[in-house]
Every structure is written in C-alpha cells, then in structure tokens.
Swiss-Prot record:
It comes from the Bacteria. The keyword Transferase applies. Pathway: Cofactor biosynthesis; biotin biosynthesis. This is 8-amino-7-oxononanoate synthase. GO terms for biological process: biotin biosynthetic process. Homodimer. Pfam families: Aminotran_1_2. Belongs to the class-II pyridoxal-phosphate-dependent aminotransferase family. BioF subfamily. The modification N6-(pyridoxal phosphate)lysine is found at residue 242. Catalyzes the decarboxylative condensation of pimeloyl-[acyl-carrier protein] and L-alanine to produce 8-amino-7-oxononanoate (AON), [acyl-carrier protein], and carbon dioxide. The keyword Coiled coil does not apply. Its EC number is 2.3.1.47. PANTHER family: 8-AMINO-7-OXONONANOATE SYNTHASE (PTHR13693:SF100), CLASS II AMINOTRANSFERASE/8-AMINO-7-OXONONANOATE SYNTHASE (PTHR13693).
Length: 394
C-alpha cells in the first residue's frame, strides 16, 4: 500500500495548489459549438484552427478509407502495417511541406509526441549537443533527455544567447531545437535567425511546426514556408490533428535523414502503424488546406485573431502579444485563473485554465484557441462574459 499512500498524498498536494487537471467529455464533433458534459457550449479549447475536424469531405474520406483498408493497420510500418494510404500521404506531405530542401521525403507518425521523440533520439546521442529553447514543448524536452545528448537551454527566442552558446561549443554534432509557434504564448520563433546561426556554426535546425502547419505560410505550408527558409540542414516536424483536422504527425527532411529515421527511430519502428483511414483523410485535408477553401478559412481566422487581440486589450488582465490562433490571457494565480474560467463556463464558454507546470509559476492563464469555425458573434459573447467577470471581480 506504500505506493498508493504516496500517490494519494501527491494528489492532495496537487489539489492544495489548485493544479488538479480534469477531463471533460465531448458528445459532439469538434467544432466551435459543442456539447460538453451534456451542455451546449462555445469551445475555445481545441486546436482545430481551420475548423476541419468535422468537415464533410474529411468525414467522407475517413469513411472511404475504412471501407478500403479496414479498421486497423495490423502491424508496425516495417512488419506489414504500412498501407498504400500511408505511402500516399507521405508522398503528399513531402510535396506539400518539403519545399525547403532538395529531394524531400516525409515520414508519418501516429502522434506529434512520437515524431519529436523519434527525431531527437535517432539523430542525437553522446557526442551531440542539443540547443533547446526554454519554452519548447514537452515532447521536445523529453526527446532531448532520452537522446542522452548534452543539453543546453537558451533563453526563450534569444538568438544572441544561442549564438554565444554555439560559439563556445566544440560538439561534433550540434542540433538547434525549437517550436515554431509556441503553444502557450502563441509567439513565433525567430526562424530565419536560427537557421542563419545553424549554418554559420555547422549545426542542424529541428523545428516543431505543430501550431503553424496549415495556418501560416503560402497555401498553409507552415511557418518555415512563411519565413521562406531553404536548407539541407533543416528538419521540420508537424502535426495533423490540429489545423489538418484529423490525427497523426510527420517529419519532413532530406531523404537521407528520413531513411535514417526509418532504420533507427525506435518510436517509429516499435509501434503499430496508425489506422490507414486516418492517413487517407489527411491526404484529403491537404487538398483543402492548399486550395481556395483553405485560403478563405485562413483569411477568416486572421480576422478573428485581429478582433481577439483588440478585445483582450480592454480586459484588466495581461494579454500576450500573439498574432496566431493561440491567444493567451495571463490572469496570474492558479486560484484566480480557475475562478475566471469557471465564470466563463457558467456563460457556456469553454476556455481552459492553463497552470504550472505547463506555464511558469505566477503566469497561469486562459488559453483562448481560435478556429475558422468561430463567428464574430462567438467572440462578442466571449468579450461580454470577460467584461462581466471583470466587473464582478473588481
């Protein structure tokens, strides 16, 4: 019983600090308007940035994929589970997101977490130094730790500090690792400067474009395309359960890098391949993202971002200067943040409260996630509820 006692005490401590996380049950497709725990709500919690998760064409595509390929893959990618749908999607992703390198190739993963672990553990090891942004996603942090490489943390988005670290390093292999869009602040890494430093110091740049792919850049090709980067020393990870509206993730790089991952990336090799129907649906999603409808959705999303930025400035709390679909509003303490989120919840608005350890102590916040499925009226309701909450707390 000793372990249970330890766990129960740990949970009590989590509760005492206002850090208990609770799941909510969604009874409807992911969209701006959802049924959550039996209640009709406007959701500002998902990463469905283009509003594609319930798109009829994607629902039809995943249904068609299930009919064609069945319910499951039946094995790992190297042992019978690599379907035509997976192969086609990798070709589509290489063409869509691989414009930054000659001879691009893509590798499809079940999750973004797996893709980051696979990339860092396969490419880095003893004798490698990883230079990691202090606000990188947990999957990049864990991948770096598991790689057994030396890890140097540079201050968030501080290219000058990173340059000094690179200058002082005598590592045989150097990898700079960064999110493109940071998931809790919504800001964008100085990608052009990071690549400049990488090439000057003989390093590689690995970026996680989870929150940029589909939203940023020409035709939604991502943050790397928006920054017009091009280099054989660049590796891009992206996710397919956010703007793409389905599930999974990918790595795009020079074909030699991808072949190395196929041969050496344990999170890729030793797991069952994702369901082929999901891959089939993602290929359909890429056609929407890169077409006229995708551009219309991105334009609408940009208008929502501008409105939200203006609206948050009128609150008594601290908005983060974000030009992306992630719009944080820093409240401060855990208790106050939970109280504000609960007030919005009573107004049938689902806005998650983000607390440590996800964000630093004293910066607990509401994370307002915008989607092209939202309307201007949805934002007006959010603004009204925020103002009413602020008045009640004054």
């Amino acid at each position: 019983m000793q372990l249970l006692d330890t766990l129960e005490q740990g949970l009590k401590e989590i509760d005492a600090r206002g850090l208990r996380r609770r799941r909510r049950t969604v009874d409807s497709p992911c969209s701006a308007h959802m049924t959550v725990d039996g209640r009709n709500m406007i959701g500002f919690a998902s990463n469905d940035y283009l509003g594609l998760a319930a798109h009829p064409l994607l629902v039809a595509a995943i249904t068609e994929g299930a009919r064609r390929y069945g319910a499951g893959s039946g094995g790992s990618h190297l042992l019978g589970g690599h379907s035509r749908a997976h192969a086609q999607l990798e070709d589509d992703l290489a063409e869509f997101a691989g414009g930054f390198v000659d001879n691009p190739r893509a590798l499809y993963f079940s999750t973004g977490y797996m893709a980051n672990l696979a990339t860092l553990t396969a490419l880095a090891g003893r004798g490698t130094t990883l230079f990691s942004d202090s606000l990188n996603h947990a999957s990049l942090i864990d991948g770096a730790r598991l790689s057994r490489a030396d890890i140097q943390i540079y201050p968030h988005a501080d290219a000058e500090a990173l340059g000094a670290m690179l200058e002082a390093s005598d590592a045989a292999v150097k990898l700079i690792v960064s999110d493109t869009v940071f998931s809790m602040d919504g800001d964008i890494a100085p990608l052009a400067r990071l690549l400049e430093l990488a090439e000057h110091h003989g390093a590689w740049l690995v970026v996680d474009d989870a929150h940029g792919f589909g939203v940023l850049g020409p035709q939604g090709r991502g943050a790397v395309a928006e920054a017009a980067l091009r280099s054989p020393h660049l590796i891009v990870v992206g996710t397919l359960g956010k703007a793409a509206g389905v599930s999974g993730a990918f790595v795009v790089a020079h074909e030699t890098v991808i072949e190395w991952l196929v041969q050496r990336a344990r999170p890729y090799i030793f797991t069952t391949a994702s369901v082929p129907s999901a891959a089939h649906a993602v290929s359909a999603s890429l056609r929407i993202i890169g077409g006229d409808e995708g551009e219309h959705r991105r334009a609408h999303l940009r208008s929502l971002i501008a409105l939200t930025r203006d609206m948050l400035k009128s609150t008594p709390w601290l908005p983060v200067d974000s030009h992306t679909a992630v719009q944080p509003l820093i409240i401060g303490s855990n208790e106050a943040t939970l109280d504000v989120a609960a007030s919005l919840d009573r107004a049938n608005l689902w806005v998650p409260a983000i607390r440590p350890p996800t964000v630093p102590e004293g910066t607990s916040r509401l994370r307002i996630s915008l989607s092209a499925a939202h309307s201007h009226n949805d934002l007006e309701q959010l603004e009204h509820a925020l103002m009413k909450t602020a008045e009640a707390r004054a």
